[in-house]
Curated annotation (Swiss-Prot):
Keywords: Viral occlusion body. The gene is PH. Belongs to the polyhedrin family. It comes from Spodoptera exigua nuclear polyhedrosis virus (strain US) (SeMNPV). Major component of the virus occlusion bodies, which are large proteinaceous structures (polyhedra), that protect the virus from the outside environment for extended periods until they are ingested by insect larvae. It comes from the Viruses. It holds the Pfam family Polyhedrin. GO terms for molecular function: structural molecule activity. InterPro entries: Polyhedrin (IPR001746). This is Polyhedrin. One of its GO terms (cellular component) is viral occlusion body.
Length: 246
């Protein structure tokens, strides 16, 4: 017969744990992982320390080099609601001849000591009617099969809102491609047609671009399409003599 003062092993025992000697298992594991993460982070930072001597532009379009603009065309396009329209058809022979003949003019200063580092397709969109309140949409694909014929009009599917200044900009340089492109004068002097296919389209994409609006009505858009070539400029040669003429 057990009394309130006698020992009963079935009642169990009560322990008071001192937090000085016992810790939560979850906090122990989290602290260990946190220390391991900090050690790995320090090792990664040490490997990246030599790169702090270099400066890069967040936006390659605004980086070092000269932006040489080649305007392809300015046109007014009528866009229906809930649809997007194809911007440019690269396969048109007249379009190619007119565009690249302008590219080879003297007004486009590319010489042997300059390199094309990148090419941007820039589309500037403006409404033609006053007091219109809508935003421009755009959608593009960089690559497709050579035999693919894009549709003139498509329905809006996952578009992107065009940002500041109603300007849509796409970098056409292929990842791991042949940039920089050099010695352009000698290339296109030999064969004009081969230069377009072998030099330009070999290193840069021919994108498919559609534009539209989020308006519920039919809208007129003034499109200005241009190629902007990012040209690397080299420092001029140092003079051989230091005299009054220099």
């Amino acid at each position: 017969m057990y009394t309130r003062y006698s020992y009963n092993p079935a009642l169990g025992r009560t322990y008071v744990y001192d937090n000085k000697f016992y810790k939560n298992l979850g906090s122990v594991i989290k602290n260990a992982k946190r220390k391991e993460h900090l050690l790995q982070h320090e090792i990664e930072e040490r490997t990246l320390d030599p790169l702090e001597r270099y400066v890069v532009a967040e936006d390659p379009f605004l980086g070092p080099g000269k932006n040489q603009k080649l305007t392809l065309f300015k046109e007014i396009r009528i866009v229906k609601p809930d649809t997007m329209k194809l911007v440019v058809n690269w396969s048109g022979k007249e379009f190619l001849r007119e565009t690249w003949t302008r590219f080879m003019e003297d007004s486009f200063p590319i010489v042997n000591d300059q390199e094309i580092m990148d090419v941007f397709l820039v589309i500037n969109m403006r409404p033609t009617r006053p007091n219109r309140c809508f935003r421009f949409l755009a959608q593009h694909a960089l690559r497709c099969d050579p035999d693919y014929v894009p549709h003139e009009v498509i329905r809006i599917v996952e578009p992107v809102y065009v940002g500041t200044n109603n300007e849509y900009r796409i970098s056409l340089a292929k990842k791991g491609g042949g940039c920089p492109v050099m010695n352009l004068h000698s290339e296109y002097t030999n064969s004009f047609e081969e230069f377009i296919n072998r030099v330009i389209w070999e290193n840069f994409y021919k994108p498919i671009v559609y534009v539209g609006t989020d308006s519920g009505e039919e809208e007129e858009i003034l499109l200005e399409l241009s190629l902007v070539f990012k040209i690397k400029e080299f420092a001029p040669d140092a003079p051989l003599y230091n005299g009054p003429a220099y």
